[in-house]
């Protein structure tokens, strides 16, 4: 009985573990590897108005779905690790100030940047402000530029001399289109109840 209880606990813990997707070109496989993400993704989409494919494309670009992603540390003399150039962290790569604003506006004070649920909600929240800057929620390339530069930077045109950023924005748009097409054909499996794991 004890061994069976331990086995159930271990399976439960492993079921809660996060897997960095091995094939990030296929959203169906991403959600298969992390089935709990599906409801979190669609909850954010319904709450804030952005397509699930857009949310996932931005998170992919920002962190490659790594909950511990952070900018590389600067180096002194090219050798000694120093501070990071930005406070960006987690799936969404949100910086401290914007993350604090999100928590204050939503009341989600327990949010964590290493949590997919918190992060996908953050991205949806941030993109929901885009129409105020004249960006439609289906203009994925513009959404990404504004996400990267901030809405103030977008309105000032800070991106206009950043050809590399415009190329990245095109890639995000392409990923979003591909994810949307794939989502229409994803087989949806209901998660197994923990008490049926031995069936």
Where does each model-flagged region fall?
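Residue-level signal for mature regions of secreted extracellular proteins and peptides
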Residues: 9-10, 21
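C-terminal motif of bacterial Sec signal peptides marking the signal peptidase cleavage site
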Residues: 12-15
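Sec-dependent signal peptide recognition
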Residues: 2-9
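Catalytic glycan-binding domains that act on GlcNAc-containing polysaccharides
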Residues: 18-194, 198
């Amino acid at each position: 009985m004890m061994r069976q209880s331990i086995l159930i606990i271990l399976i439960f813990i492993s079921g809660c573990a996060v897997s960095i997707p091995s094939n990030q070109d296929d959203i169906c496989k991403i959600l298969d590897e992390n089935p709990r993400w599906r409801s979190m993704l669609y909850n954010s989409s319904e709450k804030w108005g952005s397509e699930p494919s857009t949310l996932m494309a931005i998170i992919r670009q920002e962190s490659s779905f790594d909950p511990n992603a952070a900018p590389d540390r600067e180096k002194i003399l090219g050798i000694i690790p120093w501070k990071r150039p930005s406070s960006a962290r987690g799936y969404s790569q949100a910086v401290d100030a914007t993350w604090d604003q999100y928590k204050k506006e939503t009341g989600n004070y327990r949010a964590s940047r290493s949590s997919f649920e918190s992060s996908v909600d953050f991205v949806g929240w941030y993109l929901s402000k885009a129409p105020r800057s004249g960006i439609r929620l289906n203009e994925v390339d513009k959404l990404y530029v504004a996400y990267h530069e901030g809405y103030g930077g977008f309105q000032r045109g800070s991106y206009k001399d950043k050809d590399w950023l415009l190329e990245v924005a095109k890639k995000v748009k392409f990923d979003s289109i591909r994810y949307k097409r794939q989502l229409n054909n994803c087989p949806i499996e209901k998660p197994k109840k923990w008490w049926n794991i031995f069936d």
